[in-house]
């Protein structure tokens, strides 16, 4: 029996291609865990047993085919009834909880164990008393092939993103009287443990920075409490073999108070539009396609995943740009077919739908055409929704508010002339308005606005609940009035400034989430040390190295390039046209995204991690991908959950509903089940 932690490094080693966060996680599960159990008889099949948490970890990193390739013939859940298989070995990937240990001992003790031998891997640090509990059973000890801490209790949801799976973090930590609930501290402790396993798994020791509290309110102290808990966990990992003793990366901990607009504004990228406007379940969507037999339309499930090169290329592009590129791809395919050339002899341009029908008839391009047709369907559906709901005008007003180009008259005029606008869209507009112009919601002003928008009292509560995240109000609202104060010291009515040096190629593409600005300041050393404190203050040299990423081998520049500011009007870049042709490469234009991804990032500086308490957005994930290219440092986004606007609004509603505290989260559906 061995009791140890994995000893491999996460930095890609030996001059090979750089390995991103999710790839490292996948490799550790498949090779360090499953692969390490192979004995002389490498062809012998094994059983993999997991609990409700570790099955999520596995399903977010690996496909069932990957697991089978490692010699796993059966995957089972720890607490479900299982058939005895005394002739086979079992691999346990479980949390180090008392309940799990009791169940494991029940499986392997006595004269007739369920399995021949057990290899046990824990998702996080196992307490000594539980180790002693295992060792105390003399019948089990000879049947244990390995006993290790994998330190993987996070859920990779992207090549550069992970979750702690705390869907209810917002209401558990920020709701009314949240600090008086026992769930408050339980949530923070589990969250800290899971975040810490990220650094244990990657063998990284971070500078832990966090948003400083502006008051003594418990909800305002959440980032500092989480930072302290994470640092306490990470400090204990220094005993792990090969774990760094000095800082190797950056961790920035913030909550939704730093940016309450990103979760609700209409983001115009293909990825964000799919999840905002379509009926998505996770990364899946069902569409109707023509029947191949001539019958009624058939339902087809679409999965948007990293294995799809078209999705990887288009996901972070503007929806209009994505639509143009899809049309170009269809045209290229159609040009290979004589029927297409004949149909276009009259000089008329073929529509994307016509091109789709033509390329579907090309058998030699079956899989590529299928992927392409899928995205044509999705983009077409999104564009129809944009047109039918008048979303362009609403999106323009939203961004004008954020950048200080619109005010009360514009909002009132929009609400008066667009009474049939979707109630949720009107609510999102007023939430943005309240963030930029909080004084417009003081007294009965907010009530009148909500009445003009024909929104319900429940919707009014959503806006007032934003204050619970922003901080405690100085004065309680008088009975029957509506009050909101996000920033009493605000003088300039703009929530964002146009970024100098960045040309707006597409209309409605001005908006950027605040973490982009925060991370750039962090790298340049300009992040306010009073607003963002550090748990582990070190020497100036070490801190400078962490900012520039000089410890990890990299010849590429790691700081943010200086931008030459040019005078411009915020309104001067607008156009009456829906979209303009792109004039420069935006970083997503290659048709060989999968191939170039591995070669482009052979050398990167030190990693930067940013963790957002209360849910992250598609735009924030996009920024992490963008900054990885511009900073030449992998930026990894972590959060308690990944929320689309409707989900976030629902969570805001629950902040004032006391009966939801401690309610069970939505069931998780593994991707390979």
Swiss-Prot record:
Keyword line = Protein transport, Transport
Q: Disulfide pairs?
A: none
- SUPFAM superfamilies linked to this entry: Sec1/munc18-like (SM) proteins
* Region (Disordered), start-end ranges: 538-591
Q: Which InterPro entries match?
A: Sec-1-like_dom1 (IPR043154), Sec-1-like_dom3a (IPR043127), Sec1-like (IPR001619), Sec1-like_dom2 (IPR027482), Sec1-like_sf (IPR036045)
Q: What biological function has been recorded for the protein in this entry?
A: Involved in the vesicle trafficking. Binds syntaxins.
User: Which family does the entry's similarity section mention?
Assistant: Belongs to the STXBP/unc-18/SEC1 family.
Q: How is this protein organized at the quaternary level?
A: Does not bind the syntaxin KNOLLE.
Specify the protein name: Protein transport Sec1a
Source species: Arabidopsis thaliana
Instruction: Give the classification, highest ranks.
Output: Eukaryota, Viridiplantae, Streptophyta, Embryophyta, Tracheophyta
State the encoding gene.
SEC1A
